[in-house]
Amino acid sequence: MEHQYMTQTPMQSPMYYYTPQKQQQIHYNSHMAPQNMDYFSQPISSHVLYSQRSSPVFQQQPQYISQAMLTPAASPRPQHQKPTIMLQQEMPSMNMSFDSDCYGPATPTLSATSFNSADSPNYHMMPTPANELHMNPFDGLKQNCEDDMFGEWTQSTSPPLTPAEVYLHPASAFTENSSYLLSTSACPSLSPSPSPSVCDPRTLTVPSNAFPCLPTLCAGDDEEHKLILKGDFTPSKTFDASELMPANHGFPTFEPLFELDVEDEFSASKRQRVDSQFTADSSFCFTDASFSDEDLTFSPCQSEFSFTSGPVVDMTPVRRSASKRAPKVAQYSAAAHSSANQPQQLPSNAAAASSSASSDDHSHSHPSTSSTTRRGRKQSLTEDPSKTFVCTLCSRRFRRQEHLKRHYRSLHTHDKPFECTDCGKKFSRSDNLSQHQRTHGAGTVVMGVMTSDMTSQMAVNVPDVGSGVLRPKSESPDASELGAMLFDHAAAVAGSSSGSQSGYDSAEDNSFQQKKRKRDE
């Protein structure tokens, strides 16, 4: 049963009666006193809101309503007190489906003809559709424009593909006003006016005579950049925009900025100064010889190798021996006379060699001393007064006499009084002999290839302890005897470091001497 609400007026005092039906056997009639209703009902609009065309009007259909919440009313309710509440389920702005064909406003072309959309006699709507009444596709316009779709679009006289103005009318409007909407060239415009002249973007470039000459942006000489930056422009250094137009479609291109692509100054070689008088000849060349240990011997106060103030300094690398021998020759005469008054004790062979060398010291001393090469620790070049022993041949000073004797034997006389007991090699200095004897190695063991029958019988040959050669023995000793042999062998090796005789044969000695580095005789 459809339920109905009652709208009450403000000044009405309703009366409620319960009238029992005749079918029921009730023997009393109940009567309720009237009650004043102080509340007012909400006014409800009686007209229907806008809705979708095909959508029905829904009414509220309550399924269950409690009788205690209902206001009792008289059974014969008047007709004017029966309004119906209508609820709209859909909003009018959301009734458009996603698959509907919507058309927005057309994009106008670059046309020189200016006309208003209100000039059309049948124009009565906004360009942008606001509802779905006129959302029908324009089949007639599409068929007429499809013929010129594949035209030559590169020509400036071709019509634009986007119409300048589209009237949102039904399809019947195009059949009635077909002569008004479309012209002979399929460009929508007014019928009495000619086709609109479309502006070609390629003709929008400004000619070169419209503006004065601009400065060039290309890389050039430094003098040209100075003139350009100062404002002294020459017509020969400018560019014409008309020359660049065919290759670049009317848009001029710019060359790189100042000196950004110059390859001369960014090459792998060292950059040279070209704008000053400083040449490469007057600059100092730092080579590997400039950072040698020769510079460490110079003291800032007593250095004899002070740089000259000549115009050009010769930077050729000088041999270390020649640079050390050069100042010594100039001081030879003074040092030779001063060393004669000092007491010296020389051997007989050293005195004879020095007397024979002093007879022609002024004539042949320079080539002989320059050719010799000094070995060992480098001596200081400063003249120390504490060094009282001076060599008469090369004016070298020493603090001890044995150092001076060693100097004569190693450099001047080439006397070799020290001989190796192992190989018989002679040396002029005792320290060289002791260093040589370490190479023999008194405790070295000569290893040989053993056969399979030797592996079972191994022992150390006791008489040949000096040579230390491992040889097989007839019977193998026990553990205690083998330990005693090893202990005695180690003690013998430690005691015979320099006094042991060589146990090598001649072939081993010759092969060892070939490996040694020989001194220049």
Swiss-Prot record:
Q: Any keyword Nuclease?
A: no
Q: Which GO molecular function terms does the record list? A: DNA-binding transcription factor activity, RNA polymerase II-specific; RNA polymerase II cis-regulatory region sequence-specific DNA binding; zinc ion binding
User: What are the inducing conditions?
Assistant: Expression is induced by the HOG1 pathway.
Has UniProt tagged this entry with the keyword Zinc-finger? yes
Q: How is it modified after translation?
A: Phosphorylation by PKA leads to cytoplasmic localization.
Per UniProt, which keywords does this protein have?
Answer: Cytoplasm, Metal-binding, Nucleus, Repeat, Transcription, Transcription regulation, Zinc, Zinc-finger
Q: What does this protein do?
A: Transcription factor that controls expression of the genes involved in the biosynthesis of liamocins, glycolipids (also called heavy oils) composed of a single mannitol or arabitol headgroup linked to either three, four or even six 3,5-dihydroxydecanoic ester tail-groups. Targeted genes include the liamocins biosynthetic cluster genes PKS1, EST1 and GAL1, as well as related genes such as the ABC-type transporter encoding gene MDR1.
Name by which UniProt lists this protein: C2H2 finger domain transcription factor MSN2
Which gene carries the instructions for this protein?
A: MSN2
